[in-house]
Amino acid sequence: MGLLSKKTKQVEIENFPPIGGIMVSKMIIEEHKKPMFMYRNKRDNVNDSGWRIFSGFESDEYTEDPNNAGIYAPSTILEIDPSIAELLLQGGFGSVFERKSYQSPWYRVTDFPLEDDYMVRHRLTDRWELDINNLFERKIEEDGDLLYTTGDKSLRIAIWNCENKTKAEIYAEKKQTVANRDESRAKTLKVFDFSDEKIARIGYMIKESDERREYNVIFGSSIIDNQEIFIAFYFDDDENLTWAIETWKGIKLIG
């Protein structure tokens, strides 16, 4: 586990984003205990945030009884403990946090088992497949791109046909683009080349930001003759660089 440390703006409870309902132990709601442990499952529906919050005093028997928890709006739990506001926004599906006392900081937990946390294989086309964690939600966007996201990590995929161009030709064009990109808005932090005999892979990493936070972005290409898969990875934590690289390599040819 590691100490949670983020550079984000203070969240206003009265203007808290509509993330969906939160399942909260009644020890918190009715017995007025503070949250001490929380995790985020893959949500059941669009009205479910996926968050499950506990006081840390619940027994297994208590937790297994559905009558001992309820679904509440974020504002209800934030009135009890506003310290979790940033966690509710920062933590994607699969996130787990705990703290040792009411006064101590929250820590990210990395060894708590979640039922939806396992790898799956998705077929992208008749030639490509992807290995990715089941915690990611998948949807097709209006422009036809394929989006996978947990909330704090995202992967966007576009498949481009490049008729009458060899893998070497497409790769050379992409390499030139990376080398000559305009860095006035975002500096190139890393350049990647994971090419092998079957697939050419090239890309780069930058940082972008919105009104709340700064995050990492990797733009990459996986290339074969006549076709390119363009991939954009978005992730908040630097430690998720390994996730992005391994997921990129997990986009592979079938067979």
Residue spans for each PLM region:
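Signature of long, low-cysteine stretches enriched in small and polar/charged residues
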Residues: 177-225
